[in-house]
């Protein structure tokens, strides 16, 4: 199974680019973040023409996640459990069927800036809820992938200029500790297991020529349960997408 995650930064604004990548890369399963549309405005038919089943958890203007699979999806969940008042569309989960089913979770973790505000508190609370939910799923002992835009820079090797991010929520000790807490449940960072080379970024800001100067960060991750990690054969970052016309500021993993 080839599984991809991509923060597309508005699926409708970049639909031509997104579809071109799907036609070329042809992942079996993909989770998308920041689709920035309600369910009814998601271009479902365009993906169905490429052979995908579609599940969407959208929101007007902001956030929004989707899951696309060449095989049917079962047990679909929209929204992260643990806070019924949370209306932000950041979580989607499904079991992708087939001879070797996989539970796939797509997340768009809160940015959290500025630190010291309710936005940072929400980020940490969201990560704690994710941790608790994953702990409930792990006893199922099934292949599980938690992929998406984590908005966390795990290690110094994952940022070109660490000093520029010291005051940012993505690089705070609390954010990084919460990411490690997920790993400490027994989850494997797919990129670190398959490659691990420094300087492999998934995001370059639109500002100040970040792409041209390779001033990037690695914040898009896939964490694998033991059963999924046993099946890991490789990881690739499609950094060439950042140079395409009208690109997202993220690239597919």
Q: Predicted segments — roles?
A:
Residues 24, 41, 76-83, 156-253:
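Metal-dependent phosphoester-hydrolase catalytic domains
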Residues 6-7, 22-40, 104, 133-156, ...:
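Active-site beta-strand/loop signature of hydrolases that rely on acidic residues for catalysis
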Residues 1-10, 101-116, 147, 250:
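Active-site-proximal beta-strand elements of phosphoester/diester hydrolases
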Residues 35-38, 42-114:
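Structured beta-strand-rich core segments of catalytic domains in phosphoester-bond hydrolases
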